[in-house]
């Protein structure tokens, strides 16, 4: 994220950490000294911009919903990424330290099974209370996504 000098006179620097587009809005609101709604998933990076703190997120849960076999959920850390395709059940695992371009799906690699199980458990917990029924708290459950979530009527 580039912050212009008219917003903050800071020395350009890189912040290492797991960030995503969802962090832009809360950062901009925070820079404007406006409240960040509690319903926002992202985190403000303002303290990182002013070098007051480092940004630490142990993992990020993301999703892509295409209403096709490509719909997926993922857990990404600084070291690796676990992907689960919610309509097919296909899983992928990438060791981002040794394979930063994600060319080798290591889901079947014996030496990675313990780590894969840990990331799968995190995803199971992230999806547990979702109305789509992707997880019952003990496993991932494949199914077609619902066409309309119940909260759409809240807007």
Identify the role of each PLM range.
Residues 101, 106-112:
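Active-site-proximal N-terminal segment of extracellular/periplasmic enzymes that hydrolyze or transfer
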Residues 7-10, 22-25, 30-92, 96, ...:
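C-terminal cap/loop subdomain of S1 sulfatases and analogous C-terminal strand-loop tails that border
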Residues 1-3, 19:
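Short glycine- and hydrophobic/aromatic-rich loop-to-beta-strand nucleating segment
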Residues 15-22, 39, 113:
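Short, solvent-exposed loop/helix junctions and linker helices
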Residues 13-16, 35, 107-108:
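Short, solvent-exposed loop/turn segments at secondary-structure boundaries
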Residues 110-136:
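A contiguous, mid-protein "functional segment" used to position or interact
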